[in-house]
Amino acid sequence: GGARSAAGNLILRSLDADSGEALPYAFVQATEAEVDAAARAAERAYPHYRQLSATRRAGFLEAIASRLDALGDDFVALVRRETALPAARIQGERTRTANQLRLFAEVLRRGDFHGARIDRGQPGRTPPRPDLRQWRIGLGPVAVFGASNFPLAFSTAGGDSAAALAAGCPVVVKAHGGHMATAECVADAILQAAADSGMPAGVFNMVYGSGVGEALVRHPAIRAVGFTGSLKGGRALCDLAAARPQPIPVFAEMSSINPLVVLPEALRRRGRQVAEELAASVTLGCGQFCTKPGLVLGLRSPGFDAFVAALGEALAARPAQSMLNAGTLRSYVEGLQRLERHPGIRRLAGAPQEGRQAHPQLFKADVGLLLEGDELLQEEVFGPATVVIEAADEEQLARALDNLHGQLSATLIGEADDLAAFAGLVPLLERKAGRLLFNGYPTGVEVCDAMVHGGPYPATSDARGTSVGTLAIERFLRPLCYQDYPDSLLPDALKNANPLGLLRLVDGRSTREALD
């Protein structure tokens, strides 16, 4: 609980993302005993932390945000070296991360996360109804796995950690091996904020090393898992959690190709513009966004041919970029090779992939691959590449979309004249994705109350939640009901006097009124 430990003997080195050379930062792989100590520290902190008022927890989150804001230019330079991300992107991501913490602080002060429901007793009814009162409490210690592509917003102090801490759950972070020094700086900021706010020891913990995640997920003190990463990694954690003597939920955001459908009237009116905008979305951040449009669909026509040609030109004109690390580049190259080897797929545009940087690529696949259930097109290629598919008619387009797996997002690019003809695609896409876009691009994910960053498997392991936005807190809460409890023993959210001033559901009616 806040104590540093380096009992292991395996030294881990942070690497320069551009050169692959070791940076002057060394870390030690956590031992099994250290993983146990971290989980136990979180377990000890949980009873005290969850009983703190929402206002106290809100102050803690705001203190973390302020500490992140205070990290200087040296921190930005460090993140830049570990990830190859440009300074402006890092600064923007830091602001996003801090504001996300502040947004959850607002949620705590607002109080609706309590989900207060009261059905007052009716002793004169036959049979009598007991007095029943429900609210929600934190699940317990949460293991969080940092993501490679967002070293701040989806990592140590990112959305999963913010949501768990807001819910009253201590956190144990498994630092991502691609930005360990960044993780250490952020962890220090969190620990300083915890001390400033008077939080219990063990409210935040972090461990390093490959393989330690397995021990963390299996640990009996851990009550839930938050993960952002590959389908392989997320599925492995889900299987581990399900095999525990006491299974726990895993909220994993894993794989999505984010289909984008370009409708005929949009092609006719602004096909080249859409091609330029789409190329910008595909290559944003070197294509290392889980919301990158990885599959583009349209109806066979001269207009679609012209659009595909313009998209190829736009992608070919964009420069190669450095990826997050050598492993990410290697995975990108392997993904391109799988596409190139497939007889039903051909490369349309892009420089030959060579060297230390990733070149944008455009491929075209036969629609029959989707119709026949070929799994290759369902696999995300993490990097600046996308695949186009043309359907013969509306019926074939709908069938192709219907054969897609679950997605984080699905996009329609169209005009008013397209809406009547293609409105039937909307209920189909509603079954496939967590966020539907019209005339926009999915790479931007706003942090707000209404956002859903989730979707059916394999986009996530649980389609009922989101990892971005204030609804994310609900993943780490569970309902608790009190029957015929005396008012003095009830939490403030359920007391008759309603001291928190909450909007509560009382006997089927929403009200802020105190009860008699």
Give the ranges of each region predicted by the language model.
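ALDH superfamily catalytic-core signature
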Residues: 189-193, 232-372, 399
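Residue-level signal for inorganic ion chemistry
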Residues: 20, 57, 79, 168, ...
